[in-house]
C-alpha cells in the first residue's frame, strides 16, 4: 500500500475529494505567510484601520452578508490577505493532484466573501472534466483534469468557487482512458460576485483619509507603474507546507525532474506585494480575470514586475481597478502575466 494521490487514469468525472483538513486563519499563519510573500495590504495588516473601513469589531464580527466573514478571536474583524485565502484553497485542492506536472489555467476565481482572521476554510475538490493528451514520442503519457474547487467557511458560507486545470501523468504508460471532454467549457460561465455587494457597508473614505498615494482617480487606464527593486523567492517548500500543498514537484526534486518548482501562488503573492508597493491605496483583490504562468520559477530567483491600470470604475470614495501584473525573472524571461480586479481608495 502506498499513500499517494491519484494518477490521471485513476480519476473519474464527478469524483470528489473532501477529505482534507480545514484550516483556521490564525495570526501565526498570516504572519508566516507574510514573511514569505511580503503582504503589504494595509487592510490585512492594520486591525484599527480594518475596523474603520469594514465596521467589524476586533473582538469578532457578526455580519451575515456577502462581505466580511464572522470571526471568533482577537483581531477577528480584520480581513485575511486575499493571497493567503486562495493559497490555502489551492493547497487544500492538491489532495487530487499530488502528481501534477503543470497547471494550465485558473478560471472563476472571484471572492464570494472576504474571510477574516479567525475564520476556518474548508475545501472540496471535484473532477469536472477529463481529457487525455495526444501521445508524444519520448514523453510519458499525460492527461488534463479540470477541477472545480469550492471553499466555504465554518458556517458553510461560500468563499471561493473556481476551476483549476492540472496536467497529470498516467500510472499505466500504455493506458488509453478515452477521456476527451471539452475543457474549454470548464468554468467558462462563472460570473463574479457583485463587487458592490462584497463591499456593502465598507467606508472606503476612511481608508482614503489615511493618505495612501496614489489614490483612486490619480491614475488612469493605460498608466504603467514600474516597481523598483526585486524580491528573491525564498522558503518555497515552507509556503507549500503552510498551505497544505502536497504537489510533489514543490517538495521533491526527483518528482520535478531535478530541480523543485516554485508553487505558482508564491509568484502571485510576490506580484501582489509588489503591486501594493506601487499602489499603497490597494484595499483588496476581488478576483482574477486571467493568470498565465509563462516560465518556471525556482527558489533563489529574483522577480521584478510592472503594474498596468487597464480599467477603472468609480465606487463613491474609491473604485474598482483592473490591473495587469507582468512579472519577470532577473535572468530575463517573463514568468507571470496576471490580470485581476482590485479595490483602490
Task: Annotate each predicted stretch with a short phrase.
Residues 1-52, 60, 68-74, 169-255, ...:
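Non-catalytic linker/capping segments at the edges of enzyme domains
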Residues 2-15, 117-200, 299, 306-345:
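HotDog/MaoC-like acyl-thioester-processing domains
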Residues 26, 82, 232, 260-268:
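Hydrophobic alpha-helical segments and helix-packing faces
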Residues 49-61, 69, 73-130, 267-310:
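Hydrophobic beta-strand-centered segment that forms part of the acyl-chain substrate-binding groove
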Residues 86, 106, 149, 224-229, ...:
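Aromatic/pi-system hotspot detector in well-structured domains
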Residues 256-261, 286-288:
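A beta-strand-loop signature enriched in Asp, Gly, Thr, and Trp
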